[in-house]
Amino acid sequence: MAYERQYYPGATSVAANRRKHMSGKLEKLREISDEDLTAVLGHRAPGSDYPSTHPPLAEMGEPACSTRENVAATPGAAAGDRVRYIQFADSMYNAPATPYFRSYFAAINFRGVDPGTLSGRQIVEARERDMEQCAKVQMETEITDHALAGVRGATVHGHSVRLQEDGVMFDMLDRRRLENGTIIMDKDQVAIPLDRKVDLGKPMSSEEAAKRTTIYRVDNVAFRDDAEVVEWVHRIFDQRTKFGFQPK
């Protein structure tokens, strides 16, 4: 019988959403063009070539290596792309994703990525075209509600601030906002103004966000209501504590 990955315990909607994020089997909610993605990221001009940091691997004449022969380079590494990033902040008020689960999603579903997890933001670094592939999936699917999440390369504050009156997460640099029922972004991730308004789609209703979130909250799905999750968290902490002290 083929092994089926379990990813995460639990019987609640939050646990199911966490499994979906980790598996990469995500529902696509919106379309973002490659040019709009490039504009939002701000690393190069839309339509321009990828700058490189070294020649393509095929031209470098590297020495024989069994690992290199068995593990194909990612497209970005093969082309010699420089390393670039995308960084998200996710609201504590039922945003679909959390920093840890963005990192799990990236590490499980993409090669050559370096996810970084902090309390209020999450960054993925990779060769530029590889990073863009990971970024596009996150920006187009249910892992992101652009009213409750922001692409923020600098001044990331807002994840723990209560939502604005229009239901949008606060952004001190005003990179994106609600206009005519959709979220638009007219600055890149470090707040440099764009020559266009990038349409990031309609925000989720508060009811839909509560169904799609990966966050346990006492006013939605409480952590202690998911008995299997509590059991496994206790088991992991118990074993880490005991064996961290190396009991004799």
UniProtKB/Swiss-Prot annotation:
Cofactor comment text: Binds 2 coenzyme F430 non-covalently per MCR complex. Coenzyme F430 is a yellow nickel porphinoid. Methyl-coenzyme-M reductase is activated when the enzyme-bound coenzyme F430 is reduced to the Ni(I) oxidation state.
GO molecular function, one term: coenzyme-B sulfoethylthiotransferase activity
Gene Ontology terms: biological process: methanogenesis
Catalytic activity line of the entry: coenzyme B + methyl-coenzyme M = methane + coenzyme M-coenzyme B heterodisulfide
Pathway: One-carbon metabolism; methyl-coenzyme M reduction; methane from methyl-coenzyme M: step 1/1
EC numbers, comma separated: 2.8.4.1
Localization (cell): Cytoplasm
Name under which the protein is recorded: Methyl-coenzyme M reductase subunit gamma
Organism (species): Methanosarcina barkeri (strain Fusaro / DSM 804)
Gene: mcrG
